[in-house]
Amino acid sequence: MPRYKLIIEYDGAPYCGWQIQDNGPSVQGALETAVKAICGKFVRVNGAGRTDAGVHALAQVAHCDIAKEFAPGRLRDGLNAHLRPHPIGVLSAEIVPDDFEARFSAIKRHYVYRISNRRANLALQIGKVWRLPRRLDTDAMHAAAQRLVGKHDFTTFRDTECQAKSPDKTLDQLDVIRDGDNVSIITSARSFLHSQVRSMVGSLVWVGEGRWSADDLAAALAARRRTACGPVAPPDGLYLVKVDY
């Protein structure tokens, strides 16, 4: 039975997240419905990152085992046809070894959080960025962000319902870059805790607004207490960009 690796792009706004849940439609559910329409029976589609409600993906990775062998291009096109009108696109499909696991074979995940730092209302980016009208000091944000890079106990920056066994994670990158009114917060790690990226972004915004210093951010990390965290950024601006294997 061949195993297929899929690269998937999606707008997370209409979904309760990647994973199938009882409280609404999911990206995983839409994909599994499309696969069933092609092969005639249920097939589990496993993703590399279980993105939260409203979070987008530019290149989510998934794998599935399908009894019938399809040419990769034909499978891609068939899935895209059955996914309409969902805002989900299968960018590519390929046959991979049986031991490939989209989630557990991953060695690094890359995310970007996008902020529109302007006073004007959003017109073309509604639901795709976090609009903040107050000018952010992105140099201060970037400098403070480096205090979070490395291996730490990220209890402060994880959701209270996070099911990870350990709060320890190694953050490989956390950069804050400005391009005009557009601010990108770029981060990468082998894996992240539930709501970790959005929690770090919200706290960095407090630094950018002058409410916190870099030392305040470091103190919040050291507190290892969820209540020490700044605000949690909305999901609108968060994108899963790439997964490395």
Swiss-Prot record:
Documented EC number(s): 5.4.99.12
Biological process, per Gene Ontology: tRNA pseudouridine synthesis
Transmembrane segments: none
Pfam family name, one: PseudoU_synth_1
UniProt-listed InterPro entries: PsdUridine_synth_cat_dom_sf, PsdUridine_synth_TruA, PsdUridine_synth_TruA_a/b_dom, PsdUridine_synth_TruA_C, TruA/RsuA/RluB/E/F_N
GO MF, one annotated term: RNA binding
Active site, UniProt feature: 52 (nucleophile)
Catalytic reaction annotation: uridine(38/39/40) in tRNA = pseudouridine(38/39/40) in tRNA
Top EC category: isomerase
Entry keyword set: Isomerase, tRNA processing
Residues annotated to bind substrate: 111
SUPFAM superfamilies: Pseudouridine synthase
Family: Belongs to the tRNA pseudouridine synthase TruA family.
NCBIfam families: hisT_truA (TIGR00071)
Record's function text: Formation of pseudouridine at positions 38, 39 and 40 in the anticodon stem and loop of transfer RNAs.
Subunit structure: Homodimer.
Name this polypeptide is given: tRNA pseudouridine synthase A
Native source organism of the sequence: Rhodopseudomonas palustris (strain BisB18)
Gene that this sequence comes from: truA
